UniProtKB/Swiss-Prot annotation:
Gene transcribed to yield this protein: amdhd1
Binding site for 4-imidazolone-5-propanoate: Y159, H192, E263
Protein name in the entry: Probable imidazolonepropionase
Domain of life of the source: Eukaryota
Cofactor note: Binds 1 zinc or iron ion per subunit.
Molecular function GO labels: imidazolonepropionase activity; metal ion binding
Organism in which the protein naturally occurs: Xenopus tropicalis
Length: 432
């Protein structure tokens, strides 16, 4: 009896496997030599994992007696790994479109924050929103990310600050994890800002004494699954000492460290992340040479967010210096009310133009390296045999089009596949 498989992607012009030796991440040199197959096919099994990838003729012969639930003719098209968005804030109510004009007029992030806008504005609206309202808007945002090719996304809480609302946000993220196809890495970010009426020290004590024990108990009860802990380490928010205490307490209950650092001011956050064994530190616009060296030595990923630097007119993260120093560079959209971007193709484009990354470097940073930052490089980030069958099919004969195009990806991405299941089929694809 012939074996049955879930999906065959056949006759692709190019399949960008990314890695070929089970690498957990790629450094600068490895990024220049991405594994790319020409005239190739890929097979995904009924368990949702990749069974084979190789020359189209070879796959055709090896699977001549097999049957497939679905077959996609990829002639003239390219196949890439599903994109991994390593940093987002997608659960909230109350958009901040009105603040965009303020930014254009010269107001800084902290100007808006101190005036009661920014995070505080979103906290007020998120606190009053129902769990169902938050889930509905969150679901739609994840669907838009998926249509732009993202198949694994890191999702933070952090617009509650008080325990009850933080737990509400984490329950919303857990529901998405249970009900939706897109994969989620859940991050507790209760230290995103200092709540009104509290000092940073009081907020730190509250998080350690009350928030984290509640998270631990809910996790033990199977109510939520939280992967990471985040702190906004910044002047006027949580200083280095408070950040250290919160991260250490989170690590003690089994959370991975993945936090905001060196964004608006040099805080020695990168050095702290390296010291504590963090999986990743995000932003790093103001990182020092010493911090870059520390990240490289510790194999702590730098999650760079070109959207934030672009929108806030910050100095660009030093991607080239980091790559040359041996840092594992990853990318994220930083989707939030302040940086309203769902599209990893757009993030990669900005990384190339503004941060001087190459096309291959940007793709590796948005796939295997972003997966590494989330502790998922063993399942995501490349199209190697044994990994989860998460795939993006674009209607172009060269894979670079997904970064080269400045927008318009809704007419380029033809299929998005998760675990071998076609979760998005674009009926409006146009020829180049």
């Amino acid at each position: 009896m012939a074996c049955k498989f879930r999906l065959l992607l056949e006759n692709a012009e190019q399949i960008v496997v990314v890695c070929s030796k089970e690498e957990e991440y790629l450094l600068e040199d490895g990024m220049q030599h991405l594994a790319i197959l020409e005239k190739a096919s890929l097979v995904i099994g009924n368990d949702g994992f990749i069974k084979d990838v190789g020359p189209a003729e070879t796959i055709r012969n090896q699977f001549s007696n097999a049957s497939f639930e679905n077959i996609i003719d990829c002639s003239g098209k390219c196949v890439l790994p599903g994109f991994v968005d390593a940093h987002t804030h997608p659960v909230w109510a109350g958009d901040r479109v009105h603040e965009f004009a303020m930014k254009l007029a010269g107001a800084t992030y902290m100007d808006i924050h101190k005036a009661g806008g920014g995070i505080n504005y979103t906290v007020e609206h998120t606190t009053t929103a129902s769990e169902e309202e938050l889930f509905c808007s969150f679901k739609h945002r994840l669907e838009r990310m998926l249509r732009a090719g993202t198949t694994l996304v890191e999702c933070k809480s952090g617009y509650g600050l008080k325990l009850e609302t933080e737990l509400k946000m984490l329950r919303v993220i857990e529901r998405a994890h249970q009900e939706l196809d897109i994969a989620v890495s859940s991050t507790y970010c209760g230290a995103h800002s200092v709540p009104k009426g509290k000092s940073a020290q009081e907020a730190t004590d509250d998080i350690i004494a009350n928030h984290l024990p509640a998270l631990k108990q809910m996790a033990l009860n199977g109510e939520i699954h939280v992967d990471n802990i985040d702190v906004f380490c910044e002047k006027g928010v949580f200083d280095l000492d408070s950040t250290r205490k919160i991260l250490q307490a989170g690590k003690a209950i089994g959370l991975n460290l993945n936090f905001h650092g060196d964004e608006l001011n040099p805080m020695n956050s990168a050095e702290l992340g390296a010291e504590l064994g963090a999986h990743a530190v995000s932003h790093l616009e103001e990182v020092s040479d010493k911090g870059i060296a520390a990240l490289a030595k510790a194999k702590c990923s730098a999650v760079l967010l070109p959207t934030t630097a672009y929108i806030l007119r910050l100095k660009q993260p030093r991607a080239r210096d980091m790559l040359k120093a041996g840092v594992i560079v990853s990318l994220g959209s930083d989707f939030n009310p302040n940086a309203y971007c769902f599209s990893m193709p757009m993030v990669m484009h900005l990384a190339c133009v503004n941060m001087k990354m190459s096309l291959k470097e940007a793709l590796a940073a948005a796939t295997i390296n972003a997966a590494y930052a989330l502790g998922r490089a063993h399942t995501h980030g490349s199209l190697e045999v044994g990994k989860q069958g998460d795939v993006v099919v674009i209607n172009a004969s060269r894979w670079e089009h997904v970064i080269y195009q400045f927008g318009g990806h809704q007419e380029l991405i033809e299929y998005v596949v998760i675990k071998g299941k076609i979760v998005y089929k674009n009926e409006n694809v146009l020829c180049l």
